[in-house]
Amino acid sequence: MATLATASGYPYPATSETPDVQRDLKALADYLEAKTATATAFTPTWTASTTNPAIGNGTIAAAWWKVGNLVFFRIKVTAGSTTTFGTGSYTFTLTGLPTPVAGIRQVIPAGIYARGAASTAFQGLLNGSLAMPLYVTTAFTALASTTAAWASGDTFEITGHYMAA
């Protein structure tokens, strides 16, 4: 297919071409797959409102990728035996990612804190910056060190997307 590109870069057939839905959808799927196939690792900054946590021998694994003006990311924190959890409300700063659109509050869709079979859902909120406070979804109160008794082996994961500027 001879293609033209829109301002966003997505392929579409030239108006002089005979439409071929299967071919055109494959071209679009190939384009999107090439755009999303490689995630970029990053290291978010984990802070708290009173005393900052320290990951110690735990791990923070994070990656992001961008399609058009949407940025997708995932963060997984696994507490180790020397992880300290700080005190106060938690915030993750998405260091190195594209800046969100200013002037609109973007709720990050999903997060979960897991301890064995128990879990707590929470949301994040971006408001024109890369600093993302975390909130427990049931009451929209801050996710904090006091929300649960954190321990070695506990995990919490954040997956989300937002509109970049």
Predicted regions and their residues:
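Extracellular "spike/adhesin" assembly and maturation modules
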Residues: 1-45
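Extracellular jelly-roll beta-sandwich "head" domains, especially the C-terminal globular C1q domain
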Residues: 2, 26, 56-61, 76-78, ...
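Generic preference for well-ordered secondary structure
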Residues: 9-12, 16, 48, 55, ...
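Compositionally biased, intrinsically disordered low-complexity regions enriched in proline and serine
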Residues: 11-13, 32, 43, 47, ...
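Extracellular receptor-binding modules and their adjoining Ser/Thr/Gly/Asp/Asn-rich linkers
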Residues: 37-88
